Amino acid sequence: LFDRFIDFSKPDFVGREAYLRKRDQAPAAILCTLTVDDNTSTSGVKRYMLGREPIMTPDLDPIVDAHGRRSFVTSAGSAPSLGKHVLMSYLPPEHAIEGTKLIVEYLGDHYPVTVAVAGATPLFDPKNERILS
């Protein structure tokens, strides 16, 4: 994950042993980008999540990682270039699969979302072609 920032040609540095141990372990949660499939409430009002909303399975079961932490929306915002409302969240590996359908609870209603990206790749211009042109 951070290997590109670490110079392993140096004989030793503070934290090297801990980093090498952690590097080989599977992560408890993966940063994911979610897109809101339908943000219309049961009363017909368009709702836009802001962050801190719980994320659940389609069966409304809470999503919990290997350390017992629940998955929540960490940040949210409108993506005009994509025409969607986008959410960020840390999800356990078994849910961090592109195309996975999940539910976000917001103001007492449940909204369908889809895992669009698992990892730190952006949704818009993932290869930086637009900025490099």
Report the location of each language-model feature:
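Conserved, structured C-terminal
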Residues: 1-133
